[in-house]
Structure formats: structure tokens, C-alpha cells
């Protein structure tokens, strides 16, 4: 079973993603801050198939988490954010995100 790390400080969104992905057959771990995500990634750096990453997080930002992930390898990262400007999208994708989904989103947008 593939494991997905959900990094989202909004409890409702985090739980919604976890529920939908679990029903689709994925194993999920949740982080509610950039600091927590970084800790989990350091403990389990090769066990995740994908990271769903919010940009606006308490503590360490999503951008910093993405930078840390890219230093270690090619773990796929899909950014989920309320930041919807073209400049922000280009910046994040250039920094190494594999996809960029703007909130609010439909759950089907993150199903793969």
C-alpha cells in the first residue's frame, strides 16, 4: 500500500484528504505544521510515495519543506494552496513541485 504524507494545518481539509485517500486504498500520515512534516520526512524519508503540501503553514513554511524534500531526492510533491497568482504558481513549480492545486478544490482534483 502506498503511503502519502498530508501536510495541511487546516484540520478539516487534512481530515477530508485523509478520509478520501484512505477510501481509495492509500495509507496516509498527517502533519499539521511544517516542523512536524520535516520531522516525519526525516524519520521516514524513503517511505512516502507522495506529499500533499500546503504552503502557508505554522512554523516552517511549505516552501522550506519543499526545498528540504528536493535536497534529498525526487519524492513527488503536489502543492495545495490558497495562493492563486500565476507568479506564485511559477515560483513553486520552478522550485520543484510536481503539481499545484488552488484551494478551494474538489476532492477529485487530488485523486490519482
What are these regions (language model features)?
Residues 1-112:
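N-terminal/domain-start alpha-helical segments
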Amino acid at each position: 500500500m502506498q503511503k502519502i504524507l498530508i501536510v495541511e494545518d487546516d484540520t478539516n481539509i487534512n481530515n477530508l484528504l485523509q478520509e478520501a485517500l484512505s477510501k481509495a486504498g492509500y495509507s496516509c500520515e498527517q502533519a499539521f505544521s511544517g516542523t512536524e512534516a520535516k520531522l516525519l520526512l526525516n524519520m521516514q524519508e524513503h517511505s512516502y510515495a507522495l506529499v500533499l503540501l500546503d504552503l502557508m503553514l505554522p512554523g516552517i513554511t511549505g516552501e522550506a519543506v519543499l526545498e528540504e524534500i528536493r535536497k534529498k531526492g525526487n519524492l513527488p510533491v503536489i502543492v495545495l494552496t490558497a495562493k492563486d497568482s500565476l507568479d506564485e504558481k511559477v515560483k513553486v513549480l520552478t522550485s520543484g513541485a510536481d503539481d499545484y492545486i488552488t484551494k478551494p478544490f474538489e476532492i477529485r482534483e487530488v485523486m490519482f
